[in-house]
Amino acid sequence: MEGERRAYSKEVHQRINKQLEEIRRLEEVRGDLQVQISAAQNQVKRLRDSQRLENMDRLLKGRAQVQAEIEELQEQTRALDKQIQEWETRIFTHSKNVRSPGFILDQKVKIRRRIRILENQLDRVTCHFDNQLVRNAALREELDLLRIDRNRYLNVDRKLKKEIHHLHHLVSTLILSSTSAYAVREEAKAKMGLLRERAEKEEAQSEMEAQVLQRQILHLEQLHHFLKLKNNDRQPDPDVLEKREKQAGEVAEGVWKTSQERLVLCYEDALNKLSQLMGESDPDLLVQKYLEIEERNFAEFNFINEQNLELEHVQEEIKEMQEALVSARASKDDQHLLQEQQQKVLQQRMDKVHSEAERLEARFQDVRGQLEKLKADIQLLFTKAHCDSSMIDDLLGVKTSMGDRDMGLFLSLIEKRLVELLTVQAFLHAQSFTSLADAALLVLGQSLEDLPKKMAPLQPPDTLEDPPGFEASDDYPMSREELLSQVEKLVELQEQAEAQRQKDLAAAAAKLDGTLSVDLASTQRAGSSTVLVPTRHPHAIPGSILSHKTSRDRGSLGHVTFGGLSSSTGHLPSHITHGDPNTGHVTFGSTSASSGGHVTFRPVSASSYLGSTGYVGSSRGGENTEGGVESGGTASDSSGGLGSSRDHVSSTGPASSTGPGSSTSKDSRG
């Protein structure tokens, strides 16, 4: 029984341990899940996921529409192939029926006349193209000047920022000095107040001591005067004078007594007088009192002498104290004047510092106002131009205001948007049959007055048609090696197409009669129209511009693509669509600022010429990557024009497009 209980308890403990381990494992899993949930619930990632989902949904819809359009185009190509086969069978059957030599000669004459007409048209178009290349070179120089102006503006902006920083530092130092001067001034005021109170107390105390000393001096002077009066000789008594006269009369009469008698009588008279004065008849007591009085008078005399000495000493002390008081008052006045002077100097310095601080503050506020106005204008221009803010959102996050360091980024995006809008405006002017030169100059916002007076002569290209097998790509800006390989392929394909065209013309001259000359021209137009891909709904694909135009009298087809094909999900909220039933359909969608937008021009006649300029206004490196321009056209564009365009892709500086590699002579077309 005990063993079963132990086994059961052991089994229960094992189960509990397993459950605890499972609980810990589940807690770790729960922590990982919470971390993943918090990461998934992050605002930025949710926004990115939502934008990616929207972009994917939009791309899927565009893919379905493109597939439908591809199927329709394949059906159209099959129908056109059937028509071509029918026309070829009809031509072959008709050539079997008609073998007249006059018809063949007439057909040759008409073909030669048609060739001369086309050559004349080609010469005119090549002249326009050469003029456009010259204007493009001039515009590149102007663009370089504008870049230099932009660098100067950035230098001035940096200098102003340094000056503002210096002014901030100067204002802070002035504020510190003014606060320290104010503290020193307050401390000096407190010390002056204490010294003033102390001087007032000392003055009151000295006045009280002077009054006490004056009273003592007055008392001593009165006592001294009294003692002087007392010590003066007494005036003779009238009785004594009378007695002396009486004695003199007795002596003269002979009645004068002896000296003894006279002495006794004198003593008696003296005793009688003393007894009368003192009120004492006993001579012993009278003598004793007299001695006491004499001793007392002598003591008083000694005391008066001592008091006189003390009086002289006190007078000397009073004189010294008065001199010390006068010197103390003079030193106090000097110290007070010195403190007033120091206070005035400090006040002047404080006023000067305050005025300087106010001036610097006013200047700083002025500069700050100009800077805020400039930022507001840049923000307004950025909003009105509908610039792409995805790169700014990625870099700055959730900031809604423009900082001082963000002005260069906003200006670069505005410059990029301006180049795009000018290109779009030039394309619209070209589609509305404006002057070719004006439309070319509008690409960079220039006019005919800005052209140089001296232009170097250029060699015109031999043709403006697309070479067979040329395909425009709008995936990304191609590198130098890719452009070189593509140019080599285009040259080979063009040579093969030229040889095949000559063979076809020779065969057609031998077979065709005079009645099928018009059909031959229409057949050539139909054959050239199958090279490009028409688009029925270009607005369904965001970030691109597709144009398809077929003209019977000109036989031309233009294709223009602006696109921002990047992985960034930030797009402008709106797109612009311009169309014309006669000139083709154009759609301008939003572009992304985080990668190079792509622009492709595919002209085959004089009506579409903008893509053959070979201009690229941006470099591929860095954050400010702008849309590249890929030009595809004739053999001359493949051999020389694209070479110059390749140079533009590799560098932002202007490249010479007037060299011999940009076009070939008319004599080399045979």
Curated annotation (Swiss-Prot):
It comes from the Eukaryota. It is found in: Cytoplasm, Cytoskeleton, Cilium axoneme. Expressed in nasal epithelial cells. Highly expressed in testis and also detected in lung, brain and kidney. It holds the Pfam family ODAD1_CC. Signal peptide: none annotated. Residues 454-473, 526-596, 616-670 are annotated as: Disordered. Its main location: cytoplasm. Keywords: Cell projection, Ciliopathy, Cilium, Coiled coil, Cytoplasm, Cytoskeleton, Disease variant, Kartagener syndrome, Phosphoprotein, Primary ciliary dyskinesia. One of its GO terms (biological process) is outer dynein arm assembly. Component of the outer dynein arm-docking complex (ODA-DC) that mediates outer dynein arms (ODA) binding onto the doublet microtubule. Involved in mediating assembly of both ODAs and their axonemal docking complex onto ciliary microtubules. This is Outer dynein arm-docking complex subunit 1. The gene is ODAD1.
